[in-house]
């Protein structure tokens, strides 16, 4: 059957039922899984609003649609179980932790967890500042008190004498290059020259930190569940539109 779409691209049930000469309810039943009522498109003053072609409804952010359909089926109208069943069939397969790549600085990781990592991995002394990592409104990360910690952990084990673990972590959080320059002065002119040896040392600490973070994120079971769910909701929720050639 050819579906009549109104000017918004939605299925025009009122118009079609007049055309075929039957009750809207019967038409809706006859169309079966060719159409779905999208809760997000329902208008309160139009009892026949919100119907969409299957290819339209079962594409886009299907995770979000499934969440809404479940709510509607549970609290408003069990008829939405039809939506739930169809969406469950097309939802992208959940990615496991092992299939998700995570990098320091990703904004879907909570700031508290960056703090926790700094404390647990780099043995950061948080007694003075509590939570040194903050994220500004512009999305830039800052680490408070990064000059205060003179421990071996900060300046040797997880950092270097020229770039502490705090500085390295802050650079990684902001996707900045880890590079160390020496101040030089020639004929009263000041310039900065890359110190290759020190840069290499700091880059190696940065590499170790990145690797450690990748496994650290998934080590704790609650943290793993939280981020697997969040990642799938944010980045694995979209389904492309498939046109069914049958009508």
Segments predicted by a language model, with ranges:
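ASCE P-loop NTPase motor core, strongest for the SF2 helicase catalytic module
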Residues: 233-247
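Charged, low-complexity intrinsically disordered regions
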Residues: 1-230, 235
């Amino acid at each position: 059957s050819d579906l009549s779409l109104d000017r918004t691209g939605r299925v025009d049930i009122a118009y079609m039922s007049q055309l075929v000469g039957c009750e809207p309810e019967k038409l809706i039943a006859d169309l079966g899984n060719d159409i779905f009522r999208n809760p997000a498109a329902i208008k309160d003053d139009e009892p026949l609003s919100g119907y969409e072609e299957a290819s339209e409804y079962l594409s886009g952010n299907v995770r979000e649609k499934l969440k809404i359909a479940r709510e509607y089926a549970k609290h408003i109208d069990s008829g939405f179980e039809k939506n739930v069943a169809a969406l469950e069939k097309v939802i992208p397969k959940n990615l496991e932790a092992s299939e998700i790549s995570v990098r320091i600085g990703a904004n879907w990781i909570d700031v508290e967890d960056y703090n926790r990592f700094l404390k647990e991995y780099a043995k950061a002394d948080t007694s003075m500042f509590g939570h040194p990592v903050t994220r500004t409104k512009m999305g830039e990360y800052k680490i408070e008190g990064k000059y205060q910690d003179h421990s071996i952990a900060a300046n040797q084990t997880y950092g270097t004498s020229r770039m502490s673990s705090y500085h390295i972590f802050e650079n990684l959080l902001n996707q900045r290059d880890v590079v160390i320059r020496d101040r030089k002065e020639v004929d009263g002119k000041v310039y900065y020259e890359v110190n290759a040896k020190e840069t290499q040392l700091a880059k190696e600490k940065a590499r170790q930190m990145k690797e450690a973070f990748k496994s650290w994120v998934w080590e704790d079971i609650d943290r793993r569940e939280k981020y697997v769910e969040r990642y799938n909701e944010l980045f694995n929720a979209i389904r492309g539109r498939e046109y069914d050639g049958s009508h």
